[in-house]
């Protein structure tokens, strides 16, 4: 059992499942900061993100750069709500390295939302124009084809959010 009281909150869900909304709610807790992948990617690579390959490359660069800092923040006792999609086994393995490296607790918030609901939210989000990225339904389908829900074998502390 860890003596570190910090918690790393992770979010898993398809595009427009409500991850960022949940992240904002979780981020209101005392001694908690939010780290948003979309903000970092849009700031660091604004002209480079046009495909899944571009996203994977840029996200991997960001993860390599930011991991040591996140571990130190967690070791310092601050909780982090990580607004990076925990949507593949490999990504969740990277996230496991963060909380294990920091010796802190974790929660994997899994948002189980149908494709139809996500696409309706996506259309609304795109129309609102307030999100860092506009995602087409075709892009949604491509990203969703790589989505892998968390499994018991991964041994995460999963909190299920059904919508």
Per-region residue spans from a language model:
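Amphipathic alpha-helical transducer elements in NTP-driven molecular machines
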Residues: 59-63, 67, 112, 137-144
């Amino acid at each position: 059992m860890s003596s570190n009281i910090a918690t790393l909150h992770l979010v898993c869900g398809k595009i427009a499942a409500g991850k960022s909304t949940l992240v904002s709610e979780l981020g209101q807790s005392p001694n908690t900061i939010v780290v948003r992948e979309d903000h970092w990617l849009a700031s660091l690579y604004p002209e480079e993100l046009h495909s899944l390959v571009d996203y994977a490359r840029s996200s991997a660069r960001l993860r390599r750069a930011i991991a040591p800092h996140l571990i130190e923040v967690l070791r310092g006792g601050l909780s982090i709500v990580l607004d990076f999609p925990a949507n593949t086994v490999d990504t969740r393995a990277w996230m496991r390295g963060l909380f294990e490296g920091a010796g802190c607790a974790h929660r994997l918030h899994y948002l189980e939302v149908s494709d139809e609901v996500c696409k309706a939210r996506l259309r609304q989000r795109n129309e609102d124009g307030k999100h860092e990225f506009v995602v087409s339904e075709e892009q949604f389908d491509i990203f969703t084809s790589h989505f892998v829900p968390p499994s018991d074998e991964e041994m995460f502390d999963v909190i299920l959010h059904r919508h």
